[in-house]
Swiss-Prot record:
Binding site for heme c 2: C190, C193, H194, H331
Catalysis performed (reactions): 6 Fe(III)-[cytochrome c] + NH4(+) + 2 H2O = 6 Fe(II)-[cytochrome c] + nitrite + 8 H(+)
Keyword Cell membrane: no
Species of provenance: Pasteurella multocida (strain Pm70)
Domain of life from the UniProt record: Bacteria
Primary residence: periplasm
Name of the protein in question: Cytochrome c-552
Binding site for substrate: Y246, H294
Annotated heme binding sites: C152, C155, K156
Cofactor: Ca(2+); heme c
Claim: Transport is one of the keywords in the record: yes
Amino acid sequence: MVVFLFILYRQSDLKFKSMNGVIIVNTLKKRLFVATTMIWGLSVTLPVLAEYKPIEQPVEPANPSLKIESRNDLFKEKYPKQYQTWADTSKSTDLDSVNYEDPRVIVLWAGYAFAKDYKKPRGHFYAVTDVREILRTAAPMTPDAGPMPMACWSCKSPDVPRLIAERGEAGYFGATWASGGSEVVNPIGCADCHDTTSKDFAEGKPALRIARPYVLRALEKIDHKFDTSDRTDQRAALCANCHVEYYFAGDLKQVTFPWDNGITVDAMEKYYDDIGFVDWTHAVSKAPMLKAQHPDYETWMLGVHGKNGVTCIDCHMPKVQGADGKVYTDHQIGNPFNAFEHTCANCHDQSKEKLQAMVKSRKTEIKDVMLRLEDQLVAAHFEAKAAWEAGATKEEMKEALQDIRHAQWRWDYAAAGHGGHIHAPDVLLKVIGTGLDKSSDARTKLVRVLAKHGITDPVQLPDISTAENAWKATGVDIEKERKAKAEFLKTVVPQWDKEAREKGLLPAEK
């Protein structure tokens, strides 16, 4: 009966929420006294966040014998088809801003760099360019300036495993992002997936390799040791170089995958809670937040394709036939529908149009419930702010803030990924659904706290209908950020490229 009562008011609240962000608070108050009168003595107290105690991570020493050739342009002549299709990822030029498309995210990430600038992904060719230009990396004018650590380069370039081999993990991670500007200059390319210095590679064989030590360690945690995996698992694991959930551990800010308990949203959440890890404290609600990255490998493994051995490569890098009749792997990683006959049609009997309609429908359904969760979270953050302003104590707030943390972690797990609506739509819907439950739990608890401090009227939400309004509501001076970045791109980045050419890491200017 208790659970049934809660489900009743949650479903009703969600219908109101899609119409008006203020009405839901009032609706929630009315139902609260009906439902909680019967269950007050039966409520379960959830464990609150522990003090941060980072797990000590292995640190790989320098390995001078590991040779990594990170310059993509050196392989243009030997592998012209592969190189040209890789270069064709430059045709993916759109830089649509999620912040402008959906200003709610500015509130959800308030106090974190993603609130300033978050764009939809484009081709691997732009990996280095985009991380330089994004407002999130700020405008460090000297090598020692912050705020970002060296770890922020880790997914962007084959220069990263080269530097780790040369310096060791402590030497690589223990530096600022700005200090790597003239070293990390080649975008995601050949040496990220292949042993480009090996005899096998020279003879035209794939020579698949993962050279980032932290990735190899993570794969072992889930019994996917790369060296002993079969070819299918190895091909998929290459994408785990980057398309995974991770965090920066300890003072070293070492890239670490939270896979000790498994790869599900609950398993990773437990890992973070057990060690008390917090990405940032929310600027509005003061909740101890987690920021999901892009758990694509995890959702793929949990979905129908992963369970049936259909890998990332099968769908995004198919075998195609060149004009000379020879078959090669297409390196223009992108939408499988762009190469339908070589990807989807290998397994599916449906027409391209029918499959596209099915995928579009799933995407729309997931987006709809995701936006409902965003609305709940936006309201929860501002209701928490109102509770603090009314005099709430840390003890009174801790359970509601923990619910906000868990709810937004689930939203972000679904939102941050690429293609989850096709990789594992059932997984995403479940994740978002439990996020809605937890956001409702948070708001229920906040109503009690607000009432205890004399707040019985609905909490008025600020106008966040545009990105500019949302930045204003959360205290972001976006024009100041843009001006600083423009100066950085004008003065610092050209110097980085000049130094990289002097080191031989980039080809000479033509």
